[in-house]
Design a protein with these regions (language model features):
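Glycine-rich loops and low-complexity Gly/Arg-rich segments
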Residues: 35-37, 43-44, 161-164
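N-terminal-proximal low-complexity accessory segments that begin disordered
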Residues: 1-39
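Glycine-rich flavin
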Residues: 48-182
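Intrinsically disordered or highly flexible coil/loop and linker segments, enriched in small
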Residues: 6-10, 39-43, 130-134, 141
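Short secondary-structure junction/hinge motifs that connect adjacent elements
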Residues: 15-22, 43-55
Length: 182
């Protein structure tokens, strides 16, 4: 938790959040995610929450699924988390990991188009296995008020240049949005 407390500029409803780990909008999901990491090291849950790959222990949620049993193991881990936290958690694992697995599965096609991109996918997956980060997907431009035409939106809803200087450009707005609570 300390690692996400430092060096963050997080704003909620226009106000800077002083400590993301204590803010009522972020604390519940941060605490649950910390619990999931703790479960991976707890002797009671370790065999359910982790898997051995090439001699290394990895989070089962990040591990590439190759067999039906791999999928059942992921399901058991998810069920265990739900039982342990006593509720429904919308993000028990990385919601983007499935896309990474799909790209990994499609490497033969990707190699024909861009071998470096294909290699980057493999490198990224193995880095995720080793370091066990928690991705947050932010993969689309903000939608804004969908009842308004694009030209009628808040001008700062989308990323745009507001000033050019000899040193570069100044931008304002958002490039990506996420529905994640963290």
């Amino acid at each position: 938790i300390d690692s996400i407390r430092a060096n963050r500029d997080v704003y909620m409803n226009g106000e800077k959040v002083k400590d993301i780990t204590k803010h009522p909008m972020f604390k519940p999901i941060i605490d649950i995610r910390a619990k999931i990491y703790d479960m991976q090291h707890d002797a009671k849950f370790k065999d359910i929450m982790t898997v051995e790959n090439d001699g290394e222990i990895n989070a089962i949620g990040n591990s590439l699924p190759f067999t039906q049993e791999d999928w059942w193991s992921k399901r058991r881990a998810t069920d265990t988390v739900m039982e342990e936290v006593g509720g429904v958690v919308t993000r028990v694992g990385d919601e983007t990991v499935g896309e990474m697995w799909s790209l990994y599965d499609g490497q033969d096609v990707l190699n024909e188009v861009d071998p470096q991109f294909s290699k980057n996918i493999s490198n990224h997956i193995y880095k995720v296995l080793k370091e066990d980060p928690f991705h947050v997907s932010a993969n689309t431009d903000p939608k804004g008020d969908r009842s308004l035409a694009p030209q009628d939106q808040d001008p700062d809803m989308l990323l745009h240049v507001v000033k050019e200087t000899d040193q570069g450009i100044v931008v304002r707005g958002a490039k990506y949005e996420t529905a994640a609570a963290y």
